Amino acid sequence: MISKVRKTVLGGLLAAGAFAASAPAFAGKTLDAIKQRGQVVCGVNTGLAGFSQADSNGNWSGLDVDICRAIAAAVLGDGNKVKWVPLNAQQRFSALQSGEIDILSRNTTWTLTRDASLGMFFTGVTYYDGQGFMVPSKGKVKSAKQLKGATVCVQSGTTTEKNLTDFSRANNLGIKPVVFEKVEAATGAYFAGRCQAYTTDASGLASVRNKEAKNPADHIILPELISKEPLGPSVRRGDDEWFTIVKWVVYGLIEAEEYGITQANVLAEKAKSQDPVVMRILGTSEDTGKLLGLDRDWMVNAIKTTGNYGEIFERNAGPTSPLGLPRGVNNLWNKGGIMYAPPVR
């Protein structure tokens, strides 16, 4: 028989659990600061075509840029309310740790060391990549295993530098790294002939070849990938609410693609769709925004600004973009890829 005291305690716990399940999120310090200043401060690459790059008028574009725009739209209702902070590889983590930026969306690889020791949380993967090599097409090298004793240009302070050393040792290649602090210096040295190869993420190789080579056909990207490079945005530790918001905006973009919600049809789907999942994503049946401390239309605003994940990929990096990259593993889980989002519910 349950005592009166135990009944009271049990009843209180059940009530607390029910309240926790339905209560709105309390705004964290990052969200409060963003709303007060009216901008999301986003750390991006200094210039990587397809991911984050400014034109001559200071207009930013790219996959990483669109992720920040979607977050700003979800949080503030306007994807243009973003302050861009260009950062090199050495600056990016200290800028996040110090509070200079709210989010780092800068082709950064999710690793154990970074996750556990740099005071940051990765919020998901927005591009599954792998490290490769670029060499002159007129040379004899057609495989990374043929780089024995070669000089290879690489940027310091990156997983790329460490992977190069590991690959060389594992295959007894005796590769000679030529290390540069700035990526522009590394690529410039390669195109000037100071190195026999250049290495970075495969997406970065395509970007550099497209943007910097006088004739892109003069350079080939070797077929091997020597590492896994899951790239995605990250936030500071210590603000669970902000971490949850950024994570679920990314998931929402992936979920929107899976259910056919696009930049062009999002408002029509909101008005007429009877699909329970679509209705939850767009806030017509459930106010999921309340759980995040956001407006009911948080995902409507995000999708209206950038489109879904597939649209973001195709526009910036896909086969019809200047980079011309295949969707590959970055396709949805039900289309041969590994992009997968937990349900928005």
Sequence positions of predicted segments:
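Acidic, polar ligand-binding/catalytic clefts
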Residues: 69, 73, 77, 81-146, ...
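Bacterial N-terminal signal peptides that target proteins for export
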Residues: 2-12
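Bilobed "Venus flytrap"/periplasmic-binding protein-like clamshell domains
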Residues: 41-50, 60-75, 109, 129-185, ...
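Short helix-initiation/N-cap motifs at beta->coil->alpha
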Residues: 82-94, 177-192
